[in-house]
């Protein structure tokens, strides 16, 4: 099952709009909407908000088109929002690194040292880096899947492994459930930041393949 894409925050949208304008003054609202993954009307509303706050100015270019330009105030705001974004990113990195380290320490103590990561992206890369500090072997990083059959196909070629660690930032619950169905609850884990809720007893029983 495909889950809805997480909506960006207000600051993220403003940063995206300012960045798009800085890169290309002749950028269209439609292209900004496509790039940010938001509705066209929302882009229009944020452009007007940026205009009213003096973050951008508008100029006309032929033929009957408009160009947007960052004002000095807009450049300052873009720098501030960028710094905030990076700080948030660093906070994510620190939290992910700490939680992966604690999880791998626990798994190593249980003798589960060869792991398959399920779900690519930033969290998977952080997990792979942290694994080296705990003598954990990563069998591979598989794409996330919301069903056991798809997950089985994605794990093909990994060879034997002791456990799955879910690292998917999207479809986390669905992927976790599929992994439990495939291996059983005692061989499936996820960092706490994914906030995967406990499974019902029937689902947690799994097939234990």
Show which residues each predicted segment covers.
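Hydrophobic, well-ordered beta-alpha structural blocks that scaffold small-molecule cofactor pockets
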Residues: 22, 30, 35-55, 61-209
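Short amphipathic alpha-helical interface segments
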Residues: 12-26
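Short alpha-helical segments that sit at the start of domains
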Residues: 1-15
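N-terminal-biased segments
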Residues: 2-3, 56-58
């Amino acid at each position: 099952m495909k889950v809805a894409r997480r909506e960006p925050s207000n600051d993220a949208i403003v940063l995206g709009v300012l960045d798009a304008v800085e890169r290309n003054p002749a950028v269209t609202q439609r292209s900004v909407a496509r790039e940010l993954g938001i509705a066209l009307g929302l882009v229009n509303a944020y452009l007007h908000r940026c205009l009213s706050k003096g973050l951008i100015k508008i100029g006309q270019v032929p033929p009957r088109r408009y160009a947007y330009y960052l004002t000095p105030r807009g450049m300052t705001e873009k720098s501030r929002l960028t710094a905030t974004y990076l700080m948030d990113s660093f906070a994510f990195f620190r939290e992910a690194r700490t939680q992966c380290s604690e999880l791998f320490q626990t798994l190593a103590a249980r003798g589960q040292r060869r792991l398959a990561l399920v779900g690519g992206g930033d969290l998977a890369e952080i997990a792979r880096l942290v694994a080296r500090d705990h003598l954990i072997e990563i069998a591979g990083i598989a794409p996330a899947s919301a069903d056991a059959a798809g997950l089985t196909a994605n794990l093909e070629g990994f060879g034997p492994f002791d456990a799955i660690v879910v690292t998917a930032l999207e479809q986390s619950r669905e992927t976790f459930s599929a992994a439990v169905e495939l291996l059983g609850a005692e061989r499936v884990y996820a960092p706490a930041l994914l906030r995967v809720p406990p499974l019902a007893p029937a689902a947690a029983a799994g097939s234990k393949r």
